[in-house]
UniProtKB/Swiss-Prot annotation:
Entries under Pfam families matching the protein: Kunitz_BPTI (PF00014)
Main location: secreted
Species of provenance: Palythoa caribaeorum
One Gene Ontology term of the molecular function aspect: serine-type endopeptidase inhibitor activity
Family: Belongs to the venom Kunitz-type family. Sea anemone type 2 potassium channel toxin subfamily.
Keyword terms of this UniProt record: Disulfide bond, Nematocyst, Protease inhibitor, Secreted, Serine protease inhibitor
Cell location: Secreted; Nematocyst
Species classification: Eukaryota, Metazoa, Cnidaria, Anthozoa, Hexacorallia
GO CC field: extracellular space; nematocyst
Designated name of the protein: Kunitz-like toxin PcKuz2
Disulfide bonding pattern of the chain: C1-C51, C10-C34, C26-C47
Known role: Weak serine protease inhibitor that has been tested on both trypsin and elastase. In vivo, is not lethal to zebrafish larvae.
Amino acid sequence: CKIPANAGNCNNHQERWFYNSHNRKCETFLYSGCGANPNNFKSEKQCESTC
């Protein structure tokens, strides 16, 4: 949860959630569909329960 979100480099854009450790909250970002890191969640609830 402390690493920055990684949008990846593919073209299958989808909204995902990541934990922003600077703001101390889960936020959305556009994920490309590949190249994810562990700070990548399908829902806000999943992000909040993990981080």
